[in-house]
Amino acid sequence: MSFLPGEPVPPGFEEDVSRTAVIQKQIESYTAGPLIGTEYTIELHEPAQLRPNYFCVLCQTCSDGRNVFVHWTSQAHRTKYLQTHFQKAYKELQKLKRTPNSSGDLVTATGNLVKCIEKHFGRSRNLITATGDDFRRYRSKMCSQVRDSFHFDECAGSDFSEEAQRVIRELKPDESIKSSMKKNVDGTGDSNKQHDDGNIIALDAISSDDESFGGSTASVVPVPKGRQKNNLSEDAGGRSKNQSPPPAGGVNKTQHLPTPKELAIQASKISQERYKWEKFRCMLEIQLKQLRSDTEMYESNPEKHPDYPDEWKQFWNRRYKQLQEEKKCDPNQYDYKPEWISYWKDRRIVLFDIAVNKIKKDLKEKFKLGDEDEEKTLELMERYKIRVASPRRAPATTNSDNCRKTKPNFRNNRPIVATSKLPDAVIDISDDDVDSPPSRSRHSHKRRSISRSLSPKRGGRRAVRRSRSRSPRRSYNRGSTRSRSRSMRHRSRSPAHYRGRGRGREPASKERGSSSRDFGGRHSLQRERERSSEYYHRNEGYARSSRGYESVETFRVLDSRVYPEYKVTKTSSISPTASSNKEKEKEASEPIEEGPLTVVSVLRMLSAVEEHLGSLGPKALNLLSKALAMELVKPNAAEDLLRNEDNCVFLETTKEKLKGILIAEVLDDPQKVRVIKKLITNIAEIIYQATFKGTNDAVDVKVKANANPAPIQLPFDRNLVAPKLANALVLNGYNNVSTGDMNNLLHMLTLLMKTDKQRRQLDNNNGLKFEEIKVKLGLQNNPSPDDMGIDLDELMKEVEHQLHKESVDIVNKPTGAPAKVQAADTVGGSTGLESLTDSDLQTLLQNFKFLSNEEQVHLIGHLRKLEVQDPSRVDRLRKYVNLVELRGDGESCSDFLARVVKIGGASKAKPATKFKASVMGGRTSSAMAASSASATAPKVGHSMLSAQRPNLDRDMSSMPINKQRRGRNTPSIMLDDDDEEDDDYNFDDLVMKACDSNGSASAGGGGGVVGAGVHNKPGVPPIIGVESSPNALTFKPAAATKISLKDTENIIANLMGTLSKNGTSGGSPVGGNRNYMMNQQHGAPNAQNAPNLGQNPGQNLGQKQPGAGYSNAGYPGQQQQQQQQQQHGRNFGQEAQPLMSGLSGGPNANHYPNQQGYGGYHPFAGNGVQQNYGGMVPPGPGGYVGPPPNPWASNVPPQPPFNQMPQNFMGAQQQQQQQQPHFNNMFGGRH
C-alpha cells in the first residue's frame, strides 16, 4: 500500500504505512512490453548505495535497477509465473516444444499470452520495500509474505487456455492440428463451409439446421450415388406410385435416420450442458457463502477489505477537491472520518454486488456458459432433433388460421407446412401418430410412406384404432424394412416411456388445435419445470411436447438428475411447525449416548464447540490436557479438578455463554444446538456432583485428619520468653544448662501463661494473682480487673490430664464418625445457633467468660449437638477454647465448658475456708525467702506444712475439679518431645521440697506463717502445692547434667524477679537478647562466685555484699510499700517462699544498706549504680549520674508508678517506718 506525499492514510492504517518503491513510477510508465510477476520483487535499500537492489522471490535472483526490467521480460520469469498461476495455459504452450524449430515461436507465443493476461488483469504495482539488514535477518518471513500476497491466477478469473490455443493457431499450427483439420473436411460437398476453425470437431454435423445433413453424415450412414440420383430424380420428376404428392413449396432433400451413436452424442451434449449449470450453481453458492462471511468480517474490521485503501484514496481526493472549490474550510484540517463512515457503509454494499457479478462472470467464462442466466437444454433438444412424423412442434411463425383449418385430406395440409419452412425433420417411430392424419405435414413424402409402411404388418393388432383407407397408393419399398427395424429398436429401448405417454395422452384433436397457439407458453413453462425439483417426476408433459427425443434418453451419459444437491436446501418453503416436528423426530430417533458422566467427557465435548466459545476455547483445551494427564497418572483423578474453585467458576461461565448462544439463536445447524443443550446439562450435572461429593469427602478428610493431630503448640512464641529465661539463668550463675532443661523450663513457663477466668476461680481469699506473670513477662500490659488467680497444683494436674487424653485419643481414635454424622438428623431441638458459622463460634468460645449464664448454657447445648452431628467441626473449634491444653483431650469441648461453669458457680457459692486460705497464703509468699532465710526457718515451715498437709489434702480433694478427676488414673505424659530421656521428678515434688528447704529461713526472719495469712486480702487465690501423684508433670532434662530441685526452684524464683520490667516495657525478644548479651559481657568478673549445678545457690547468696543487690525491677517507687511489709509481719524475707516468689515484685528494699530510689535495671551486678528514671536521686557510692539505655525498657520518660501490691499494705501510719537493711540472698551476691 503506497500513498503519494501529503496524502492521508486511511483510518486504521496509521501504523501500517510502507515505504513507496522507487521503481514504482518506472513500472507504471513502462511501455516496451508486458510486465508480469512484478509483485514478486522486493526492493532492497542499502545505506551505502544510491540505487536499490531488487530480489525476485519467484526466480530467487537478485538484480539492480538497470537490469530488473530485463529480468521481468525474460522468458524464464514469464514461464515460471505461468507455470505457477496459469497451469492450463502453460500446458498448451508446451505443445510447441514438440515441434521442430519452435523455440522462437514459444517465446513469441509466451509474450502474446502474457500480453493478454496483462490486458485482462492489469499491471501489478504492489512492491515491498525493506532494508538490506532487515531482509537478511527476516528473509524467510518476507518471502513467505510475498508468496501469500495477492497474485493474478486462473482461480480468480479465466484460465487463458483458449487464448493460448488461439495464439498457437495464429502463430504456427503444427502438423497434428492440420491433420485434424483435414479429417473434419467432408468429401461429399459443401459442408466444409461451417468449419472455419478446422481444429474443433463440432457436433453440429448432425444438426438439422444444415441442409446438407446427409453429406455430413455420409460416413455414418453411407448412401450410394445411384440411390441419391434416384431420390433426386424422384423428387424432381415426380413421385413414385407409393408416395404422396410433394409439397407445393419446392423440392426436399434426402435425410437419413440417426444412428444410436449419434443419438448418444446429442444426449451427452445435453447432459453436459446440464452438468455445467449444476456445477456453476454449486461453485457460485460456495463462493457467495465465502463472500458473505468476508462481508460480515468487513463490517467489524473495515480496514481488512482489499478495496479499503483505494476507496479511501478516491473518496479523499474527490472530497478534497470539493472542499477546495467550496472554500469554506481548510481541506487539510477537515475531519473526513464521519463522512467516510457513512460513505463506506453504502459503498460496501455496492462492492458486494460488484463482487457477486464478477464471480458469476468468471464462472460462466470458466464453464463456457452464455451470458443468460438460464440453461439452453431445450434449445439443444430442438437443435438436435430430426423431425419425421411428430406434429407436436410447430414454429411460432405458422399461421394460426391455417392450423385451425384442418381437413381430413392429408394433401390439403401440405402447403401449410411447406410455406412454414420447418428447419428440422423429426423421426417419429410411434404408433400413435396415425390417429391424426389431417395435421401431418412433411417435407418428404417418401418418409411418410416409410413411416406408414409399418401398418400392414400390424393390421391385426391396430385395425381397431386407425383406418387404412386414407392413401390407396401404398407401396413397400426397400427402405420400409430398415425403417421399421430401426423404429422397433428405438421403441424397445424405452418401453416404459411409451406406456407412460400412452396413459397421459390427451385427445388428438384438442392437442393439435392448441399446439400452435400455446407453443410460446408451453416453452416458458418447460423452462420453469426444468428448474423445479419436481420436474423430473412429472416428465410426461415433456414427453407429450417432444416425443421424437424421448426414445433416446437411455443414451444419456451425464444425467444431472442423479447428482446430489450442492446447495443448502432452503427451509423457507417449509413451515416452522413442520421443521420443528422433523427435528423432534430426529432427536427421538437418535440413540442417547449412555455412559458415566466425567470431567473428561464434558471437556471433550467443549473442545468440539471451541469455535463458539471465543476466548474460553483455549482454556477448555488447556483444562482437557490437564485432565488427560491426571488420568494417566491415576484413574478418575480428573475429578479432582472440580475441587478447585477456579475450574468450577470457568465451567459455570462456559455454561452461561452456551446458554447465551442458544438464546441469541445464532446457530443454524440443529445438530450443534442439540450438542450445546447437552453440554449445558452435563456441565450443570458434574458441578452438582462435585459439590455433593465435596461435602461428603470433607467429613472423611476431617475424620482422617483427627487421627493425626498436630503437635502441641505453645501459647506464646518461644522467642518471646527464651531470651529472658536464658538471661535469668546466666545472672544466677547457671552457664552450662543443657538444651533439654531449657526446653522443659520454657515449656512450663509458657503453659503457666495460659490462664482463663473460669479455670482460675478457685479461691479469691488468699494468694497472689497468677495474671501478674503475664504482666511481668511483658505478655500483657495491665491485668484485667476481673481476672482471678489459679491454684498452681490444679493447673499442673490439668496439664497432665490434657496431655494424657491427647495421647489416648491418638491411639484409640473412635471410628464411628460416619455413624455420628448419619445420626445427626435424630438430634432435635434448636436454640437459634444452627446458623452460626465457624467464625461466629470461634468468637463465642474465645469470649466464653463474658457470656451470661443462659448464653453459656445454650452454647454448651449447641456444642453437644455438634459433637454428634459433626465431630470434625467441633475438633476444629477446640483450639479456640481458652486453656485448651489445660483440659483433657478425651473430654469433649461441651463437657469442659460445662465443668468450667460448674466450677465457677461452686467457687462463688462456697468460698474457701479461712484456715485453708492462710495455708495457701503462707505457701505462696514463702518463695520470696527461699534464698535468704535463716537455718531455723526450714524446720518451722516443714513442721507446719507436715501438720497441715492432711487437712489441706482433704480440702483439695473436696473441690469440684478434684472430685471430677479423682477417678482418673492416667500416666503422666512428657511435655517435651525433643529429648528421649526422662526423669521422674515432678513439679509437685519441686514445690514441696522448695517449701521444706526454705520455709525455716522465712520463719526465722520474723513472724509466724499462720498468723501472717490472716491479714491477706480476701478473694486472691493462693499458689499451693500437694503431694506427688502419678499424674504429676514430668520433665526430661539432658542426660549429661541434671539440675537439682533447689537449683530449679531458685532458677524459676530468680527468673520471675529478674523478668520484671517497667510499666512501659514491651517485653520484646530483642530486648531480651540485648540483656542476655550484656550479662554475658559483664559475667566474667562475677564468675568466681558462681555456684555449680550441684550446689545450693542459697549458700553463696546468703553473704552480705554492699551494693550488690538488685533494686525492685518491676515497680518503681515502692519504698513505701516495702516499709508496710515489716509492720504487718508480711516481709517477703520472713516466710518460706515457694517457687513463684519472684512474682511479688522483687526483693525488699530494707535489705540493702545503701538503698537508693528505684532507677531501673542494673547493667551488671555489684557496681552500686542505679538509674533512677523517676525521681533522679543521687547515685550510690560507686555510681555515676546519667542513665545508660535500659535493654528491658523502651527508654522513654517513665510513667507514674504502678502499684501491684495488695491494698491492705498501704497504711498511712506505716509509711514513715523503716526497717534495718536486710540482704535478700534470693538474687545472690556478686557472681
From Swiss-Prot:
Keywords, alphabetical: Phosphoprotein
| GO MF entries | transcription coactivator activity
| Biased composition range(s): Pro residues | 1178-1203
- Which sequence positions carry the modification called Phosphotyrosine? 549
The ranges of region (Disordered) come to 171-197, 210-259, 389-547, 570-591, 950-981, 1058-1203
Q: Which residues carry this modification: Phosphothreonine?
A: 970
Q: Which Gene Ontology cellular-component terms appear in the entry?
A: mediator complex
Tell me the residues on which Phosphoserine occurs. Answer: 449, 451, 453, 455, 573, 589, 972
Annotated Basic residues bias: 440-450, 458-502
Compositional bias per record (Polar residues), positions renumbered to this chain:
1076-1103
User: Where is there biased composition of kind Low complexity?
Assistant: 1118-1127
Question: Where does the record place Basic and acidic residues bias?
Answer: 503-541
Q: Give the GO biological process terms.
A: positive regulation of transcription by RNA polymerase II
For this entry, the protein name equals Uncharacterized protein CG7065
Originating organism: Drosophila melanogaster
Q: Lineage of the native species?
A: Eukaryota, Metazoa, Ecdysozoa, Arthropoda, Hexapoda
